[in-house]
């Protein structure tokens, strides 16, 4: 995975040069995917800064990016180019000044810019200058608290309009639906520059009379657009049916009927235009449309020589058209104009009350925020807009400060952000120029209220240096191969139309390959569908560059989970084959072909949250390393679920499901049989009561369950009572910390797969509790209610991240997260999953222009039905959803560099290919892809895959579960030979009584970490214990230690045990002290060392940071980013010195790494088998012990069949283009500053460890490092290990 490849060529294309040189007041650059827009934007800045005729300085620029990461990368690129220019003109004082000013330049997100403006001009508004910006989690906490308190007040007032609103929209059991409605409308209103003005204007939409003309309502134009769209769909279906009837062998008898139906629907469409002539009568039009009846098709006899398949296709197309027409009638033409307007009248008081409540709630929300001295992100933009709107002197100052405002990713801004930019760059002669770059085809943040229409409005009005502004197109694509681009262009030229997406995908915007031609040797047999199933014909086989569409037929089930599993099976099998058979792929950086790695693959999905666990399980079965990059899944994590269940029963233990879950969890450890014992012993009661009775009866010597079960229960319920008491007396965070301490749950989860992530999730859970405690009205009950609301609202915190982007794993990520990235091979899965139209299903729909679209609730008959407002907004949202999904598919397909796989499951696939849906009627991505898969399609390689569960190229359902259950149900018996049994018994007895001749070797564990070897000089010699001393006695003494750690603490003296165990606890128990239990905030030495290792492991070293640009400030920003990503904690961040890291990268080898970041491999894990006798013979102290025990060294060689398994992780392995270098970081605190002494100590301590590293690299990776170094971080000393 790499960042978007921005063209760094010295020779720019004509269009790129135009972008760099264009001087105009307003410029819009429409940059297609992979067009190198970032490089062009940087070059435009550099050209202006180094131009002696341009007075622009870097602090005269305002550069707005979408993310802080993009801002940092932009700043780094500008710094590199400035230094490059300065190296050519070292005496240029102007360039020196620009480089100095760069760190203070306004290159940031719009939020950061707004924050700076408010810090500077706070005194104009009633703002606390010491305000802080609250996290999204804190904001949600506060909003929930405010709405709860506000609704209590409303209930107390008892207004009729309020109770009518609650009865209509509050829900059956409580008022949660109304709460959600108010909060949703409040958040939605904040996307407008003047939220309250917009809310008040919405009230006017319902001020109508039955005497009014329907066409004068705000909703009519949207209704007209929706009706026209559906009419056109009908006509297209009928026309396609007509074309089918006219084919040779087609049902020509249907042609006349189809022509009549086409003509009638076209007449209906034309009549809609009459509204412009003021002669449109809704009621009469509705009657005509609703009264239209379709004729019966003429019969076709067997003697008419009609192809049966064409006849079926023709009927299917006509049926599609008829269903679309019937849907249209049902939606719009079953009620009169007066009834439609009367609905709006009825809704007026309810909507007025709802809007008033949103405004009142906002008042209270603002008041609480001011009391706390906090703002949310929305406040930053609204306050700045208020400043610019009300205080022209501020605008004038900013006009004088900035010469040009540059906006990256302009397609993703919202209305408030655009309003701010317009204030900053007005049409006055003194206002700064506005430069905007983006790609509306990649606008995929509608859920964040982004407005692609803002881009489209300028795109439609700007021209080559028109009065409104200048438009420049960047079509050249420097990322993808011509084959990938051909498939993208082919598909979107057929589905992306102005009416459906707002932009026409034509010659003006299609992607043009910019990569240079390269030699490619295709396989001899190019048409084998199973080319990845068998052995490659030669080891230099190059991956086929055609886009492949893999279709999985699903006949018997609607299970999305099963579809996902089968698609994952296909993808995992394909990836394994491509990697194991050593297919090659072109690498731009090498300008040559190389073998595929797992890290070359990404799987993109629209619904990653739902699919991650299923895909991960399948990949584990196939042995393919996979990392699912999610911002979700936190609340579903098993360890978090256990903690939530425990908190629920601490609040109220009479909850059967949470209680059973905790009892079954590792916190208690009952198995399913024990749970059944408890229930059987006390049926008819709640589970808590059943447990209490079991415990009571055990005291009275009437045991109903086993003694083992009772002991577990007694221990847990004693703890439970204690925790219930703590919950009433102490804070939530203290309660959770006590649970962690008593149960050792943090340590327990570390032993499972993904242990680091599980621990991080539990730490995050504790941190959330700390945050919650900081709010008023906190407590266990409110915390649980709050979490429940977050889950209901699909608000997820995201699992902690513990995998870096440098690891050789396949990535699974959402399409949204992949934006701006590129990958050699891309799989887009789940293409048969239906689009999410949930925003069109609620009782109240919201739209930026149309306002509110409520359903009308008939309280008397307890029914609800859609209004004209609801239907208008539903139609508009439906079109916007399809446009967004089309752009999302475009983003997914344009991530691929060399190879694109499209994978989807569906029913009746062949039928849908022959009779596809209209693009505007698509329900999923496959509906857009099916029409492109006809027999004449050469750009898409269509494949039905032979994977488990499929036969003869077509899908069949295979019930794996039933198969395994049938095996388990079988009874297997063996006849036992008594004589043979006695022989085996004697053999076993001999084995048990056997005395191992090399007992000294048992003191070396069978599996150990390489870091243990650092202690080998004080380790192996102390393992030569007396033959009379049993290992079991030592194990008993250290029974809490893992077997692999026992040798580290064995000593030759009898009284060393206790001290050694305490030493182990100090150095190996993670520091888990929360702030309220700490005497200070420091970490132990071991923890500090781990923190520094994590920093070197995860710092993003990429091609944008060379030796000149790597600064302490950048390191500081990157460390802060690791905290934000929860890779390191703030406490760990505090002990990491930027200076220490800088010292490493300023060294000769550190500089080489920055110059060639792709040559660096970090955190390489390995497992190595080493003969046990080598481990013993390698120590001088061991030799002395052998002599003392009269044991010959040759005796050790008898252990050659015994193997010690060594596990380790190599910190850095670096290839500079010629040689490999092994680097291992050490943070030992030594009580000397003498460099020779430091070198001697570290070499002696770690020599064996480094030798194992070198051996592993040579044997496993087939690489021989030229040199191996220890790097002592505290002193910056490089120590070569021979």
From Swiss-Prot:
GO molecular function: 3'-5' DNA helicase activity; 3'-5' exonuclease activity; ATP binding; ATP hydrolysis activity; double-stranded DNA binding
Residue span, UvrD-like helicase C-terminal domain: 516-820
Protein keywords: ATP-binding, DNA damage, DNA repair, DNA-binding, Exonuclease, Helicase, Hydrolase, Isomerase, Nuclease, Nucleotide-binding
UvrD-like helicase ATP-binding domain mapped to chain residues: 10-481
Cofactor(s) this protein cannot do without: Mg(2+)
Reaction(s) catalysed (UniProt annotation): Couples ATP hydrolysis with the unwinding of duplex DNA by translocating in the 3'-5' direction; ATP + H2O = ADP + phosphate + H(+)
CDD domains, per the entry: DEXQc_UvrD (cd17932), SF1_C_UvrD (cd18807)
EC number in record: 3.1.-.-, 5.6.2.4
One annotated GO biological process: double-strand break repair via homologous recombination
PANTHER family: ATP-DEPENDENT HELICASE_NUCLEASE SUBUNIT A, UVRD / RECB / PCRA DNA HELICASE FAMILY MEMBER
Record-stated family: Belongs to the helicase family. AddA subfamily.
Function, in words: The heterodimer acts as both an ATP-dependent DNA helicase and an ATP-dependent, dual-direction single-stranded exonuclease. Recognizes the chi site generating a DNA molecule suitable for the initiation of homologous recombination. The AddA nuclease domain is required for chi fragment generation; this subunit has the helicase and 3' -> 5' nuclease activities.
Designated name of the protein: ATP-dependent helicase/nuclease subunit A
Species: Natranaerobius thermophilus (strain ATCC BAA-1301 / DSM 18059 / JW/NM-WN-LF)
Encoding gene per record: addA
